[in-house]
């Protein structure tokens, strides 16, 4: 059995080791958090650069597509019947404008 006074240089550093481990884990956590934030920022920048190009290509493809597709999209967006989105609509535009102008004419019987 060893004599307790045999080696005087060793001391029980249980509390100091626990504190060092805690600091090391805290430092590792901060480093991982910074890396995650950098990755999220990089993904946001990549999306911000990709989305306008994607929209441009999509709009160019849509503009070069058939008018049938454009009519379907216009009917969906404006919630008008599909039949009302064709060339007849353009021809009837003047007639609708005239009926709207006639109905919005003020009557002379008003006070103002």
UniProtKB/Swiss-Prot annotation:
The entry sums up its family as follows: Belongs to the nanovirus movement protein family.
Taxonomy of origin reads: Viruses, Monodnaviria, Shotokuvirae, Cressdnaviricota, Arfiviricetes
Residue stretches of biased makeup (Polar residues): 98-112
Give me any GO biological process, just one: transport of virus in host, cell to cell
Give UniProt keywords alphabetically. Answer: Host cell membrane, Host membrane, Membrane, Transmembrane, Transmembrane helix, Transport, Viral movement protein
Which stretches are tagged as biased composition: Basic and acidic residues?
86-97
Domain of life, per lineage? Viruses
Q: What is its main location?
A: host cell
Species per Swiss-Prot/TrEMBL record: Milk vetch dwarf virus (isolate N) (MDV)
The reply to whether Transmembrane helix figures as a keyword in the UniProt entry is yes
Which segments cross the bilayer? 27-47
- GO cellular component annotations, sorted alphabetically? host cell plasma membrane; membrane
Q: Tell me the segments the record calls region Disordered.
A: 80-112
Q: What is the name listed in the Swiss-Prot or TrEMBL entry for this protein?
A: Putative movement protein
How the protein sits in the membrane? Single-pass membrane protein
Q: What does this protein do?
A: May transport viral genome to neighboring plant cells directly through plasmosdesmata, without any budding. The movement protein allows efficient cell to cell propagation, by bypassing the host cell wall barrier.
Its annotated compartments are:
Host cell membrane
């Amino acid at each position: 059995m060893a004599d307790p006074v045999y080696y005087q240089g060793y001391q029980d550093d249980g509390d100091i080791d626990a504190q060092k481990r805690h600091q090391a884990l805290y430092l590792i956590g901060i480093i991982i958090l910074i890396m995650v934030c950098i990755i999220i920022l990089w993904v946001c920048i990549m999306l911000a650069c990709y989305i306008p190009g994607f929209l441009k290509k999509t709009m160019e493809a849509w503009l070069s597509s058939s008018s049938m597709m454009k009519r379907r999209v216009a009917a969906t967006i404006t919630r008008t019947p599909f039949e009302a989105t064709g060339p007849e609509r353009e021809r009837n535009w003047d007639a609708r404008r005239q009926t709207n102008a006639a109905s919005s004419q003020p009557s002379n019987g008003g006070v103002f």
